[in-house]
């Protein structure tokens, strides 16, 4: 809205743009026919809707689980999963390309950490599934590649935007962050006072067994 205001574009047009992207899954400005031609031209000249590129999609035999491989602008790739639950659709997103944690049972960490995903790249995984299914996404779990609490700021901002009623309106109570135990940011998340579920992926009751 602030960008539109700066360029003397009516405020309600920003809401229309958000609706096109996050609810109608229309990403080509020329297809946004509620906008006058001059605004569509201005958007095309000055703005970019950048989503991860869908590389492959795998669908389970029962059709209730879909896994996608997506590529970012720098050609790095991550996976995301859509699960159809009794209450609606849940998306599992990645938070990093690779991972630095070194958990021996996890394939994501084998090549080490390449980089953090941006806020837009995290949200983009959810938007792609919305576009594929044309269905509302009810819950999000940050349980794909990467340690979410090591990419704390981007993950939290992505969840806050997904919670925004104008964007996806997903309840914080329907969001889960999975961690292998990045303790400093566990406390930091607790201090946020948000009812986001924290899942601990420890796989053993003590470090000796876990490291074996």
Where are these regions (language model features)?
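Canonical Radical SAM [4Fe-4S] cluster-binding loop centered on the CxxxCxxC motif
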Residues: 84-121
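Short linear Ser/Thr-Pro motifs
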Residues: 58-60, 94-95, 108, 178, ...
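Flexible, acidic/Gly-rich N-terminal and inter-domain linker regions that tether
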Residues: 1-89
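Short, small-residue-rich loop/turn micro-motifs
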Residues: 72, 97-99, 202-204
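Conserved alpha-helical substructure of the radical SAM core
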Residues: 110-139
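Conserved AdoMet/S-adenosylmethionine-binding subsite of the radical SAM
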Residues: 130-139, 144-212
């Amino acid at each position: 809205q602030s960008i539109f205001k700066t360029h003397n574009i009516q405020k309600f047009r920003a809401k229309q743009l958000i609706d096109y992207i996050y609810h109608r899954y229309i990403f080509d400005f020329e297809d946004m026919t509620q906008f006058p031609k001059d605004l569509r031209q201005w958007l095309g000249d000055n703005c970019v809707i950048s989503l991860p590129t869908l590389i492959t999609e795998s669908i389970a035999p029962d059709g209730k689980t879909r896994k996608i491989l997506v590529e970012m602008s720098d050609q790095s790739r991550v996976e995301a999963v859509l699960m159809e639950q009794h209450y609606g659709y849940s998306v599992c997103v990645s938070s990093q390309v690779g991972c630095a944690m070194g958990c021996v049972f996890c394939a994501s960490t084998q090549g080490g950490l390449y980089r953090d995903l941006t806020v837009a790249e995290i949200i983009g995984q959810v938007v792609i599934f919305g576009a594929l299914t044309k269905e509302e996404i009810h819950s999000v779990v940050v349980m794909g590649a990467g340690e979410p609490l090591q990419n704390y700021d981007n993950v939290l901002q992505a969840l806050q935007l997904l919670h925004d009623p104008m964007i996806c309106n997903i309840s914080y109570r329907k969001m889960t962050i999975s961690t292998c135990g990045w303790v400093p940011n566990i406390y930091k998340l607790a201090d946020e006072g948000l009812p986001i579920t924290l899942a601990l992926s420890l796989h053993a009751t003590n470090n000796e067994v876990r490291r074996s």
